[in-house]
Amino acid sequence: MEIKLEKTYEINGEIKDTIELDFDKLTGRQLIQIEREFKKENKGELILVANNAFAAKVAAFCAGIKEDDILDFSGKDFTTVTTEVTVFLNS
């Protein structure tokens, strides 16, 4: 799924105004591993499906970029991306 961003960002040395979320490459095993990493980093915090921090971690994996790149997006772009992940996780 390609998402058009409002701003441009330097991601992996390239200037981008889109992000590609490849949910098809995400397996259940990988999703559980991302969840474990999230809980470890956040001292066991419960993962709510609408948790933006968890959604950002999933988005970074699906896009093949660093989580910090997602976290550096503008509020609007961050919300757009994490909302798409949340919709996917709820489907």
Label each PLM-derived region with a short phrase:
Residues M1-S91:
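Short, surface-exposed, charged amphipathic helix/loop patches that serve as local interaction elements
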